[in-house]
A protein has these predicted regions:
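Beta-lactam-recognizing serine transpeptidase/beta-lactamase-like catalytic domain environment
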Residues: 1-181
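Ligand-recognition elements built from short beta-strands and adjacent flexible loops
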Residues: 140, 154, 182-287
Length: 287
């Protein structure tokens, strides 16, 4: 998927790509009524070369906040309007029960056309019906969604084997009433796919949202594709230096082949933090 977005970024060019980034509100505070909001980190346009253009196109090298994500996705699915988010709906006098102040939807700008928004809603619904978001599928309801994987940064460098797995969902996708953003910071002992981490949890939250908002069933949702196309991948744990029993516990999802004698792992293949598919074999050298 990333090479495809690199190609799209190149076709758009840096001026147009970063114009959309700006219009969707990234790199600046949303103005939400919460203290301590961050702006995120976006490249300055005059410092964007071919590498920065390519990495930005698939979401690496930049930093955004969850509320920016929600505001931007809301604009994608609501017909194209970026709105100022708010937490408090109104303030009520405790003695008189009268509304002192009320907060209403405040449109900031039109970012994309109604037609583009409609296409995107269909595409997001396809992700849940036929793609990596199938674990969020709820029969009778039109759910749109997109999985996400962000590599974590420490001391200015990307960390190996440390990720934020996320899932963004909208319900119902043809006439959105709610957007959900769910993230898990560095999930452990699980497949390296949001399809297996955040998406099943998101489905349970979506059921609560449907109940709370009394969203009605529809009979025109996209039919779920029952063939699972995603390959399950894992990050290989580091077991070098551990004893045989401890290594066996950490590698319980894999087939293990031992060589050498002794009880301490001195070498492993594949190396720690590499990505491998489910049912792969890991070879350990004991000493």
């Amino acid at each position: 998927m990333n090479p495809g977005f690199v190609k799209l970024g190149q076709l758009l060019g840096k001026e147009r790509l970063f114009s959309y980034i700006d219009k969707f509100g990234f790199g600046k505070k949303t103005g939400v009524d919460l203290n301590g909001e961050g702006e995120g980190i976006i490249f300055n346009l005059d410092k964007v070369g071919k590498v920065e253009l390519s990495t930005t196109a698939f979401g690496q090298g930049v930093s955004v906040t969850p509320i920016q994500q929600v505001a931007a996705v809301s604009a994608v699915v609501n017909g194209g309007y970026l709105n100022k988010p708010y937490i408090v709906k109104n303030i009520v006098d405790n003695d008189t029960n009268t509304v002192i102040k009320e907060y209403n939807k405040t449109p900031i700008r039109k970012v994309i056309s109604n037609k583009t928004s409609s296409i995107m809603r269909y595409a997001l619904e396809s992700v849940v019906a036929k793609g990596g978001g199938k674990s969020a599928y709820i029969e009778g309801y039109r759910i749109g969604g997109k999985t996400g994987t962000a590599q974590k940064v420490k001391d200015g460098k990307y960390m190996v084997g440390n990720y934020i797995m996320s899932f963004m969902a909208v319900v119902p996708s043809n006439n959105p009433e709610a957007v959900l953003y769910l993230a898990i910071d560095n999930p452990k002992n699980t497949a390296l796919l949001s399809s297996y981490t955040t998406t099943p949890i998101a489905r349970r939250i979506l059921l609560d949202i449907i109940d709370a908002l009394d969203i009605k069933k529809q009979d025109n949702e996209q039919e779920k594709d029952l063939e699972w196309t995603d390959k399950i991948t894992y990050i290989v744990p580091n077991v070098v230096g551990k004893d045989k029993d401890e290594a066996k516990k950490l590698l319980s999802d894999f087939t293990i082949e031992y060589s050498g004698s002794g009880n301490k792992v001195v070498e492993q293949s594949p190396k720690a933090f590499e990505k491998i598919e489910q049912d792969a074999t890991i070879r350990l050298l004991l000493e």
